[in-house]
């Protein structure tokens, strides 16, 4: 047998060896031994052509959504799978509108009762309990059933006697944060419920509903909504009816006490002193006695008369000889 090593090389290789190798011109070195910018560009091109590390495909190969064309009567749709493994279809033009998981890409699930849309099927199943009589959450202490787990936790606080929410202004405690927020309106004076007819504000929604029945029967059944706070200074309110108290009206004084009057630095309502400070009665028109009280002259013939100055004959003493 012939030795395979003794076979002559192909003519192509022998021809290539006969050609002289072209020597590249020396590349000038830059400062600190770095080549000029042209060599750096070639190195970058070389790095991009090298194969990447194992387990890391190039970026062009990384496709985030798993897509597949779906034939839907002539219109091309895409079948996408979200991060939870739920498939959904979207039009082909809307696949590049936003990032994955956006509301425009995910096909909503509609409730057949109220036509409310949900992004996930699990949300729709949780919502469907509100339209049924199913109450899967049962209290272990009393056996009462609830539709939501949050309602069961709130009910369990009654058996445990827990009131974790405490008011910072008074020692009262509450089971829920909503009850504490409602209680804060008592301290702040906020009245977020306003009557649309007479513009009267109330603290509670039930008080506004009672106001509808008493004052505006045509508004009974109207939904009660929160209104924005009034930027103007709110007047005083009656606690029961919510009727604003008229300012400037004198309130009834308690029994046995004189009503309070505003006292200024120049006038006094106690006696008939003039603005100059002299006591006694002055002389008005037509010779009638007038009394200056608070800077306002009062005639004797009027219904409202001020206190008259006492003369020497008004004192009940025996006459002096």
Curated annotation (Swiss-Prot):
DNA bind region: 49-59
Comp. bias intervals (Polar residues): 1-14, 39-48, 262-271
Chaperone among keywords: no
Ranges in a coiled coil: none
Keyword Protease: no
C2H2-type Zn finger ranges: 109-131, 137-159, 165-187, 193-216
Annotated InterPro entries: Zinc_finger (IPR050331), Znf_C2H2_sf (IPR036236), Znf_C2H2_type (IPR013087)
Composition bias type Gly residues, residue spans: 274-285
Record-annotated disulphide pairs: none
GO cellular component terms, semicolon-separated: nucleus
Major location category of this protein: nucleus
Keywords: DNA-binding, Metal-binding, Nucleus, Repeat, Transcription, Transcription regulation, Zinc, Zinc-finger
Location in the cell: Nucleus
One Gene Ontology MF term: sequence-specific double-stranded DNA binding
Ranges for region Disordered: 1-80, 86-105, 248-321
Annotated family: Belongs to the krueppel C2H2-type zinc-finger protein family.
UniProt function note: May be involved in transcriptional regulation.
Protein name according to UniProt: Zinc finger protein 524
Classification lineage: Eukaryota, Metazoa, Chordata, Craniata, Vertebrata
Gene (name only): Znf524
């Amino acid at each position: 047998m012939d030795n395979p090593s003794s076979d002559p090389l192909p003519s192509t290789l022998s021809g290539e060896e006969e050609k002289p190798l072209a020597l590249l011109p020396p590349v000038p070195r830059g400062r600190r031994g770095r080549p000029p910018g042209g060599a750096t560009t070639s190195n970058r091109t070389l790095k991009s052509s090298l194969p990447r590390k194992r387990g890391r495909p190039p970026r062009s190969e990384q496709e985030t959504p798993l897509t597949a064309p779906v034939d839907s009567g002539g219109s091309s749709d895409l079948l996408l799978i979200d991060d939870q493994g739920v498939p959904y279809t979207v039009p082909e033009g809307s696949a590049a509108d936003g990032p994955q998981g956006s509301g425009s890409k995910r096909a909503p699930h509609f409730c057949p009762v109220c036509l409310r849309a949900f992004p996930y099927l699990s949300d729709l199943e949780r919502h469907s309990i509100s339209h049924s009589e199913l109450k899967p959450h049962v209290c272990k202490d009393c056996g009462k059933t609830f539709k939501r787990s949050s309602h069961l936790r709130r009910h369990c606080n009654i058996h445990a006697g827990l009131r974790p929410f405490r008011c910072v202004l008074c020692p009262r405690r509450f089971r829920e944060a909503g009850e504490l927020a409602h209680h804060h309106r008592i301290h702040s004076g906020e009245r977020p419920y306003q009557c649309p007819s007479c513009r009267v504000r109330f603290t509670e929604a039930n008080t506004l509903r009672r106001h509808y029945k008493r004052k505006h029967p045509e508004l009974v059944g109207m939904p009660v909504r929160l209104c924005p706070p009034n930027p103007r200074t709110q007047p005083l309110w009656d606690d029961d009816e919510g009727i604003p108290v008229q300012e400037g009206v004198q309130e009834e004084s308690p029994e046995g006490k004189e009503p309070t009057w505003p006292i200024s630095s120049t006038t006094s309502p106690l006696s008939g002193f003039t603005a100059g400070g002299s006591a006694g009665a002055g002389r008005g028109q037509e010779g009638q006695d007038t009394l200056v009280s608070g800077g306002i002259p009062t005639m004797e013939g009027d219904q409202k008369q001020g206190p008259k100055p006492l003369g020497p004959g008004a004192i009940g003493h025996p006459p002096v000889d």
